[in-house]
């Protein structure tokens, strides 16, 4: 149910059934106000651990905590009426054991009310994904470039250029599908490989830096809106440039405060006559 309890939101089963129908529209969301703006237009909203970089200024997603993800998941859930909401499991919250993953995934679902969790990993995480899905936890898989592993993967770069890399990602995708994931995020791979994976698996692929042939697309909302300026990946398109708009608005506010023209009479309360 939605935050108002009046409408039904998309389920993970409905997202899975969208494969081969129409493209799945996805974006990241971290706060209630942004979730409200995105919700009417999106099939799925991801409370991504990218919030560590976008909101908190971290250099990577590694420093994000479970408590941070739960707090932002709660905020996003207050703003949705339609979209399926998935919460990222942060680094260190699921890699130790499948039991640890289940314990923390259940905490996310119970404390946020979200529809599922996302975790990174391929063949090495398939047993964990199967353990979760067998116990009622919907899992959104993630293969290709994995930001939580960037420190050991040689940085941010497109993967699958070599046959060895491509074959590993193919095996990863198949393993996560067979483990019971309802969808698969494919990140930072060469276009032909993402296209091939989309055709070879029976669950939806949602691409970021992948291929237009994927069953859906996702971007970090702050990237898409032109709000995050630390760096711009090749795969990002700015559908708006809000950073200059915000800067100009703050500049105008500052000038009016200094000139004592704000607040004006229309912004203040007067005694009754």
Curated annotation (Swiss-Prot):
Positions annotated as active site in the UniProt record: 187
InterPro entries: Pantoate_hydroxy_MeTrfase (IPR003700), Pyrv/PenolPyrv_kinase-like_dom (IPR015813), Pyrv_kinase-like_dom_sf (IPR040442)
E.C. number: 2.1.2.11
SUPFAM superfamilies found in the cross-reference section: Phosphoenolpyruvate/pyruvate domain
Reactions this protein catalyses: 3-methyl-2-oxobutanoate + (6R)-5,10-methylene-5,6,7,8-tetrahydrofolate + H2O = 2-dehydropantoate + (6S)-5,6,7,8-tetrahydrofolate
Keywords: Cytoplasm, Magnesium, Metal-binding, Pantothenate biosynthesis, Transferase
GO molecular function: 3-methyl-2-oxobutanoate hydroxymethyltransferase activity; magnesium ion binding
Subcellular location: Cytoplasm
Cofactor(s) essential for the protein: Mg(2+)
Cofactor note: Binds 1 Mg(2+) ion per subunit.
Top EC class for this record: transferase
Subunit: Homodecamer; pentamer of dimers.
Family recorded in the similarity comment: Belongs to the PanB family.
General function of this protein: Catalyzes the reversible reaction in which hydroxymethyl group from 5,10-methylenetetrahydrofolate is transferred onto alpha-ketoisovalerate to form ketopantoate.
Protein name: 3-methyl-2-oxobutanoate hydroxymethyltransferase
Organism: Rhizobium rhizogenes (strain K84 / ATCC BAA-868) (Agrobacterium radiobacter)
């Amino acid at each position: 149910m939605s935050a108002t309890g009046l409408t039904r939101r998309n389920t993970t089963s409905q997202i899975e059934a969208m494969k081969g129908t129409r493209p799945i529209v996805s974006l990241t969301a971290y706060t209630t106000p942004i979730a409200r703006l995105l919700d009417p237009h999106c099939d799925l909203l991801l409370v991504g651990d990218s919030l560590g970089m976008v909101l908190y200024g971290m250099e990577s997603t590694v420093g994000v905590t479970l408590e941070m993800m739960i707090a932002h998941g709660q905020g996003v859930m207050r703003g949705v009426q339609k979209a399926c909401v998935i919460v990222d499991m942060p680094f260190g919250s699921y890699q130790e054991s499948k039991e640890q993953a289940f314990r923390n995934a259940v905490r996310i679902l119970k404390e946020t009310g979200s529809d599922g969790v996302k975790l990174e990993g391929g063949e090495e995480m398939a047993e964990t994904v199967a353990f979760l899905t067998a116990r009622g936890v919907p899992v959104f898989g993630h293969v290709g470039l994995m930001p939580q592993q960037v420190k050991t993967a040689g940085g941010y770069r497109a993967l699958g250029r070599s046959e060895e890399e491509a074959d590993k990602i193919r095996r990863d995708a198949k393993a996560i599908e067979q483990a019971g994931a309802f969808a698969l995020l494919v990140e930072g791979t060469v276009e032909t490989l993402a296209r091939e994976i989309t055709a070879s698996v029976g669950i939806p692929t949602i691409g970021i830096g992948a291929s237009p042939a994927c069953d859906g697309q996702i971007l970090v909302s702050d990237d898409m809106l032109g709000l995050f300026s630390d760096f711009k990946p090749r795969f990002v398109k700015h559908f708006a440039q809000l950073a200059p708009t915000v800067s100009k608005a703050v500049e105008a506010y500052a000038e009016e405060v200094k000139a004592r023209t704000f607040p004006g009479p229309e912004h203040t309360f007067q005694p009754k006559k």
